[in-house]
């Protein structure tokens, strides 16, 4: 590959800043790769316009990069890369500059294209949603070390470190397996449905939506119940995430609806009880 001139390598790259040619319009930028491959001008412009339309910036075809917002420029850069028909597609944080709504639309378009893409695509991202929704395989790196290299579904179900689990928005508690669960490194005991061999170093993973929140101590089915205090409330789309601290368990993140929060009169500093069913805990050996 290194012996070939760049335009013959079949590689397209989208850097974080887009790197559009400032003297060319969005349309000419997008058609550039096709023209270097010898595609006639009219055909290249038609295909370029089609890609701009798919990514929601077709109406900006005749604008120069200096006339585009950061999110618009990023979509044009993505259109330019996809239009070039590469064998290797390199995407560096391709959706980072987009707002939430646009990101979902572009992610859908990109996923549809990658499903039909015959080449190799390498995506670098800090967004776990982006990684698991676009990739066939996820390689998780931390400080240069490979923490996990598996299909997205396996990474989501069985994260191999607290860092990976928390990156995916899960509660992650390391500990040592006992006959009925896990003795937590941060203090406390967790009952699980499928315990490992006693003495095994393991990681308990709990989804925030699996944590029930009550104002009174629950008397129902949860095997794991702790008192705690709400320390932080953040909005995550249509749900609220609560950071709950306790002297009987490590910090816990719960996810509830705004309606449930209103009914429970949840606020910063509210005293609550949390519950986790044993069947909702995934235990991964370390």
Segments from the language model and where they lie:
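Short clusters of hydrophobic/aromatic residues that line enzyme substrate/ligand-binding pockets
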Residues: 1
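Residues that scaffold the ATP/ADP-binding catalytic core of kinase and kinase-like folds
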Residues: 4, 98, 155-158, 167, ...
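Phosphate/pyrophosphate-binding loop motifs in nucleotide- or prenyl diphosphate-using proteins
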Residues: 7
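ABC ATPase nucleotide-binding domains
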Residues: 10, 16, 20-160
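Tryptophan-centered motif/residue detector
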Residues: 13, 51, 163, 226, ...
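ABC transporter nucleotide-binding domain
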Residues: 151-178
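Non-catalytic connector elements of ABC transporters
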Residues: 171-286
